[in-house]
A protein has these predicted regions:
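Pyridoxal 5′-phosphate
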Residues: 1-178
Length: 178
């Protein structure tokens, strides 16, 4: 995908324990950097990555940050505003919801700058021969027919997870893995 887009993929190395070598980060970040994509928590090693440091450094150079939250949302409370990430994504099945569902959080100001990459459905506000005007957020990115059943089921899965004492679960998990 990078090759097709003319982009350069930069990878932050890890040490023998699977932890990022943050000393190498500054050599990877510059004014050309557009987006940083990192896992909030590693699905392989379970390491809680120091994402806030990555986010702060990337933002200093004007880069956007996408956090893969597939493991983060089931292993503790997530506050995207506190993290200050631009995007946070996770799949529904990680929260005991149906496959084929997921969530993409995006900062309003970032989403408003973006153009839709698909067309159709309620995302179009008006069309003339001269231009197309898109609906306001979130409809601007809702092309086609939504997965109504999947979204309703995902909502119930999220409600279930919110009823569980996540602090107890996290403490129990830490006892099991230490």
């Amino acid at each position: 995908a990078c090759k097709r887009a003319g982009a350069e993929l930069r990878v932050l190395p890890v040490d023998q324990n699977g932890e990022w070598i943050l000393d190498k980060l500054d050599s990877l970040i510059d004014s050309k950097l557009k987006i940083v994509s990192v896992a909030h928590i590693s699905n392989v090693l379970g390491i809680k990555n120091p994402v806030q440091e990555i986010i702060e450094r990337a933002h200093r150079f004007g880069a956007r940050v996408l956090l893969d939250g597939a493991q983060g949302v089931v292993h503790g409370k997530v506050d995207v505003k506190d993290l200050n990430c631009d995007f946070y994504a996770f799949s529904g099945h990680k929260l005991y919801g149906p496959t084929g569902t997921g969530v993409l959080y995006g900062k309003r100001e970032v989403l408003e700058e973006m153009e839709p990459w698909m067309g159709g459905g309620d995302m179009v506000d008006s069309v003339t021969l001269a231009k197309t005007t898109f609906a306001p957020l979130p409809l601007k990115f809702e092309a086609g027919t939504p997965n109504f059943i999947g979204v309703a089921a995902l909502g119930e899965a999220i409600n279930f997870v919110n009823r569980v004492d996540i602090d107890f679960m996290t403490a129990h998990e830490e006892r099991l893995t230490s």
